[in-house]
Amino acid sequence: MKKVLRTGMIASVFLLVGNLYSAMAQTDNSSIGSLVPTADKAAIRAILDRQTDAWNRNDMEAFVADTMPDVDWINIVGMHWTGREAVLKAHTVLHKGIFANSRLLQPEITMMREIAPNVVVETHVNRIEGAAAQSSGAAYPDSGNLITMVFVKTQAGWRIAHAHNTTIDERAASRDPAKKG
């Protein structure tokens, strides 16, 4: 009787461990982001295209049109703007100064994945030509910016909930330890 009970317990442990490994294998690979449906990719791409067009026309109302009312936006020097009105105000001022004669080139999407239902994280590189010198006197970097955006699908369509913009430092990027063999 003890041997049957012990064998049953061992079998139960193996079954439990097997189920645990099976569950881990399923969640480890399938829950870490997923592919974005083609129609959603196209809708998000269209937002980036509208923003590019708005930037190049100095139309900051159109530039922020696809943002959430409570959007968070962090620019390349760490200014943090909360709310569509703050993002609009900041970009309007910047487009009367440093970006008045600038041209935003077509963004290059580097990554897009759904992290939860109706939530997509996207990164893209953009380059700005013709920006005036910065207040420090330094030229605006021509290396480009890496932007991470969080998009949320609403009843009105996809909207930008968060954006964080970082200048690409090509010298540092050439020594990226994650990309070295």
Model-derived regions: residue spans:
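Surface-exposed, charged secondary-structure patches
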Residues: 90-137
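Hydrophobic pocket/interface hotspot
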Residues: 51, 62-64, 71, 83, ...
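A mature extracytoplasmic/lumenal domain signature
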Residues: 67, 77, 124-128, 149, ...
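A short gly/proline-enriched turn/hairpin at secondary-structure junctions
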Residues: 72-85, 95-101, 133
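Short, low-complexity N-terminal intrinsically disordered segments enriched in polar/charged residues
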Residues: 22-66, 70, 175-181
